UniProtKB/Swiss-Prot annotation:
Its EC number is 3.5.5.1. This is Nitrilase bll6402. It holds the Pfam family CN_hydrolase. Nitrilase that mediates the hydrolysis of aromatic alpha-hydroxy nitriles to carboxylic acids. Has high activity toward mandelonitrile and mediates its hydrolysis to mandelic acid. Also mediates hydrolysis of mandelonitrile derivatives. Has weak activity toward aliphatic nitriles. It comes from Bradyrhizobium diazoefficiens (strain JCM 10833 / BCRC 13528 / IAM 13628 / NBRC 14792 / USDA 110). Homomultimer composed of 12 subunits. GO terms for biological process: detoxification of nitrogen compound; protein homooligomerization. It catalyses: a nitrile + 2 H2O = a carboxylate + NH4(+). One of its GO terms (molecular function) is nitrilase activity. Belongs to the carbon-nitrogen hydrolase superfamily. Nitrilase family. Coiled coil: none annotated.
Length: 334
């Protein structure tokens, strides 16, 4: 019988920017630390390896192109040695891990999350369905197969990236699969302070909190920190530094949190510039209490009035076909 009570953990930290091997090594340290603390699940922020591409928001596409080759070189293959190293670390620490990473597949990058079991096995990998705003100049799109909730030793586990949490239909698709534990992977929250409230920590923490309430699930809101190396590499003018952090060219923007299925915060915030791991003890039986009041895809739904249609088929960019002597055509997806 599955244990309904266990400890979960969320990372709040900066990666080693655009240095995949160093970021993987840092991640392995967090995995070992969380496992030693008794956590059964550890959540990382969005594209934590090799870090969020902040240059997209700071200057022109022409200026930003200088960073693209290095970012590609430090993005990870889903079955590559860096991911396998994370798998080995998860198995050693006996902990489930959800890692946000920049995935490279052929010549295209994706904002991806990989689910690693406490046995060190990859149980699911998903891509952000639609990159946000200027992210579309760097990353490709996911497809309907990326909306999935998987069985794990910590219950029915799902994840989304960043502003996917303000997409009502995407959220509803996830809620409909009876998600119990959700990883909300976000970048840091220093960008455009006092200039764009919609990008700030207040409203986006609220988005994760509302996800917990609407979905009746535990939410691990993982937020990165904007590291000093990001300022040093990207901010070649005072104007760019001000855009990346109006409080000064210094680390910050970490606002990780854990929410219960009733929306209640379950831990204390760390200071926004402090790296560490947040922990909370969860009890999956709390979900039944939460859903007794609100179950928007169950007893509180009216499918005869409004309903959601989801195409969960993988998107294929090429299809091979062959024609035999009897003019029969066989198609093979590739």
């Amino acid at each position: 019988m599955q244990d309904t009570k266990f400890k979960v953990a969320v990372v709040q930290a900066a990666p080693v920017f655009m240095d995949a091997p160093a970021s993987v090594a840092k991640a392995i340290g967090f995995i070992a630390e969380a496992g030693a603390a008794g956590a059964k699940l550890l959540a990382f922020p969005e594209v934590w390896i090799p870090g969020y591409p902040w240059w997209l928001w700071l200057g022109t596409p022409a200026w930003g192109m200088q960073f693209v080759p290095r970012y590609h070189a430090n993005s990870l293959r889903a079955d590559g040695p860096d991911i396998l190293a994370l798998c080995a670390a998860a198995a050693e620490a006996k902990i489930n891990v959800v890692m946000g990473f920049s995935e490279i597949d052929g010549g295209t990058l994706y904002l991806s999350q990989v689910f690693i079991s406490d046995a060190g096995e990859i149980i699911f990998k998903r891509r952000k369905l639609k990159p946000t705003h200027v992210e579309r100049t760097l990353y490709g799109e996911g497809d309907g197969s990326d909306f999935r909730v998987v069985e794990s030793s910590v219950g029915r586990l799902g994840a989304l990236c960043c502003a996917e949490h303000i997409q009502p239909l995407s959220k509803y698709a996830m809620y409909s699969m009876n998600e119990q534990v959700h990883v909300a992977s976000w970048p840091s929250f220093t960008l455009y302070r006092d200039k764009a409230y919609a990008l700030g920590h207040e409203v986006n923490l609220a988005a994760s909190q509302i996800y917990a309430l609407e979905g009746g699930c535990f939410v691990l809101h993982a937020s990165a920190i904007t590291g000093q190396d990001m300022f040093d590499m990207l901010c070649d003018t005072p104007e760019k530094a001000d855009l990346l952090n109006a409080e000064g060219a210094k680390p910050g923007g970490g606002y990780s949190m854990i929410f219960g299925p009733d929306g209640q915060p379950m831990c204390e915030h760390l200071p926004q510039d402090k790296e560490g791991i947040l922990y909370a003890d969860v009890d999956l039986s709390m979900i039944a209490i939460a859903k007794a009041a609100y179950d928007p895809t169950g007893h509180y739904a009216r499918g005869d009035v409004v309903r959601l249609m989801v195409n969960r088929s993988p998107r294929r960019t090429s299809v091979s076909f062959s024609e035999d002597e009897n003019a029969a055509v066989t198609f093979t997806e590739t």
